Swiss-Prot record:
Belongs to the malic enzymes family. PROSITE patterns: MALIC_ENZYMES. Divalent metal cations. Prefers magnesium or manganese. The active site is at residues 104, 175. Its EC number is 1.1.1.38. It catalyses: (S)-malate + NAD(+) = pyruvate + CO2 + NADH; oxaloacetate + H(+) = pyruvate + CO2. This is NAD-dependent malic enzyme. It is an enzyme of class 1 (oxidoreductase). The keyword Disulfide bond does not apply. The keyword DNA-binding does not apply.
Amino acid sequence: MEPKTKKQRSLYIPYAGPVLLEFPLLNKGSAFSMEERRNFNLLGLLPEVVETIEEQAERAWIQYQGFKTEIDKHIYLRNIQDTNETLFYRLVNNHLDEMMPVIYTPTVGAACERFSEIYRRSRGVFISYQNRHNMDDILQNVPNHNIKVIVVTDGERILGLGDQGIGGMGIPIGKLSLYTACGGISPAYTLPVVLDVGTNNQQLLNDPLYMGWRNPRITDDEYYEFVDEFIQAVKQRWPDVLLQFEDFAQKNAMPLLNRYRNEICSFNDDIQGTAAVTVGTLIAASRAAGGQLSEKKIVFLGAGSAGCGIAEMIIAQTQREGLSEEAARQKVFMVDRFGLLTDKMPNLLPFQTKLVQKRENLSDWDTDSDVLSLLDVVRNVKPDILIGVSGQTGLFTEEIIREMHKHCPRPIVMPLSNPTSRVEATPQDIIAWTEGNALVATGSPFNPVVWKDKIYPIAQCNNAFIFPGIGLGVIASGASRITDEMLMSASETLAQYSPLVLNGEGLVLPELKDIQKVSRAIAFAVGKMAQQQGVAVKTSAEALQQAIDDNFWQAEYRDYRRTSI
């Protein structure tokens, strides 16, 4: 449902002159009216012409097109964001297809690697282990009092790039940009945070420009005590905030999620957001290929926290579709670098133990090896769906894809690893190896594939289709927790907007131009489920929709009135 157009009320602010021009959330630049220029001591500080935001956005678009590399475009957009946030979001929303890969994946990966080199202006909060005893003071220094969404990272597992130390701050900044651009959450309500606990990246430690704490990463009790201090300080400062964990290492991601998801409204996008968008994609792809997800056999390459999180949510969804838990688990096969996860495999991680196959059930498999490779698994399972979350390029070989297609006329193949350089196989190859029959969704953006004069659009299985709507739904409903059922309702709603399902052609996921509409629909479904689950106060459907509309921020300038501090 589109939000009703409502007249924006005037905003009363105490700032004036150069201070106002340096305030990104309030700066209008050349769009300040003549009356505002007189009232806020801006006469002579700006060119004569008063422009509209669209005129400003057109100039910015022309300037943007003058940059030749993606990282230079990223730097330019970040500069606008740090100068005039309203203009930044108007520009991004005008060109979302072009700019989303620049402000987030894959370009944000390079921005994280070069964070200290391209650093220009502070954004967000940097909390180093050295300052752990000043946690409350640090959060009190945040000028925005009504923070509603925090994205926090410790920089240890940035995309597929590993430990980027303080450079990981690029991820919370980019993620929150999408909360606003796609989910309509006001930038005034968002806060990016990096927990600087050191780095084990020797290249960063040797870099004279590196801006983080030059120390090996703290671990074990020291690490968990530090994170706990942060969580308690956040609860004290903003008790109703939504906290998103982002790009934590596998060894910490699941323990932190399990420890805090029932203590503070929180979720891990790498685990739960990735799972939700993947399940939504699979529901739609299964319907397009014929049948339900519960009828499909699924093989994973990659059994880390993200892969296992997706697998568990698939199992939950197939149970909703009528399978028993035992039957649902028998349809999911997890392969890591040591082969298929079985009950005879040593040193399994806690979250892997429920996803093993019983070795005794594999006695009739066609294989000569004790280690069951991906090819062995594909040959014997004959899967309908192949999902890659390995972070390693090229592992979906031609032999594996052709073997899958031999037994599955309409295979669903999802190489989800980020960034583009880590993808398990390119869509071009997958389409060619399956004679144009595969349904493909990727983690990074890819151009449409042309094969034998036919165009195949490639859906990006982008978490941005999920987490902004979840955030908006949590804020609008006042949810105190994010439950598994809320995430599954987001997946089901996303699947309902699949052009391939609705029209029989096109992308398996919605186009980016529709992402705000999808986010609002997900917000409603999430808010409604939160009420049903008892983690939000029950209201009428009309009241929930009104709350979503009221909280949906638009990139428009408001009229300013002068007031004293």
